[in-house]
Amino acid sequence: MQGLGIIAEYNPFHNGHLYHITNSLEQIRPDFVMAVMSGNWVQRGEPAIIDKWTRAEMALNQGVDLVVELPFLWATQSAREFAQGAVALLKDSGVISYQSFGSETGDLTLLQRAAKLSLEESEHFRQTLHNYLDQGFNFSEALAKALNLNELASNDILGIEYLKSHDLLSSDISCITVQRQGSPYHKSEISGKFSSATAIRQAAKNGDLSLIKHTVPDQTWNLLSQNKTDWIFFKMLEQHILYKFRITNKETIEQLMEWEQGLENRIYNASLDSCTLEEFISKLKTKRYTRTRLNRLMLHALMEIDKSLLNHFNTTGPPYLRVLGMNQRGRQALKTISDRASLPILTRPARDLRSLSHYCRQCFHWEVKASAFYNLLKQKDGREEYIRPPIVHPD
């Protein structure tokens, strides 16, 4: 059985994602497609606009056969840890022959060369990278300059990290890349059929529903419309974040994963001086401390997740394959996975976790906390993680 693996967030699923899947299927023609998808919180350190179950259904509507969750602890870290956690799940499933990822360059050879140079990390490369960081460039800009590339966009960076992860994990999965279509990843305005997820979320936040409709498949549009009252935006965390940092001491801030020397004083002072989230972020944001990096720091502070805890989990990796949804082809694939995988499968956590290791239960504990907080933002029950079964999609 040959599986095609895709690592995604689908926040929300849009026409660019459909193009990626369609193009990948034309190149590979696999027996099934498995997506490793972020849960209720995404790599930008933000809540997903709509919950993971609905987003899994969006994916199943458009060519994905099996959706597995990337646990919260990896889904909300930097590109390197995000990629390592997700690639580990593809590898440990035992059934994935190919991974397809989107990239701005569409040039696999170039990305492989960049990954090789980054992995080798010669003294010259390390020093060059740090020199650019010290000059105030953010990581993606500094990495591009250190690799003598004109520019590396968000999906290029992730692609490099996927390739590095396959090497570090001794994975025999082959990679392909599909060039990203339409507007840049961070562009916040709708611009045609292939608009970015950022632009789609911004239009949703502004209530411009008519602008969204032509940027997503019809079934995605229906799910977004039907669940409009459950949309979640980062702004909803405003009071939680300001309160947290006003009562948090500097020593605690220093233990956060994204922290660097001196930031604790700026955070503490900004929290006292700011009355809105935008004001707070504007006092902290620099070229090096991007909004995304600050978002992750703020989320980890809210969840009381420090660098020692993340280092503990990063050392071992995701401990299970948690199924969010599947169709009939996905169910057949899951039977093969149960025979070949090096990790246990979770379909009903309340039952399955009883026989699993303390490490598995520890990891799932953070999933429960993260989803309970997410559901609080939309005034829903906080016990969902233990009791909700996977979506079974009709073919």
From Swiss-Prot:
Subcellular location: Cytoplasm
Function according to Swiss-Prot or TrEMBL: Catalyzes the formation of N(4)-acetylcytidine (ac(4)C) at the wobble position of elongator tRNA(Met), using acetate and ATP as substrates. First activates an acetate ion to form acetyladenylate (Ac-AMP) and then transfers the acetyl group to tRNA to form ac(4)C34.
E.C. code: 6.3.4.-
Pfam families with a match to the protein in the record: HIGH_NTase1
Protein name: tRNA(Met) cytidine acetate ligase
NCBIfam families documented for this protein: PRK13670.1
GO CC terms: cytoplasm
Annotated positions binding ATP: 7-20, 102, 155, 180
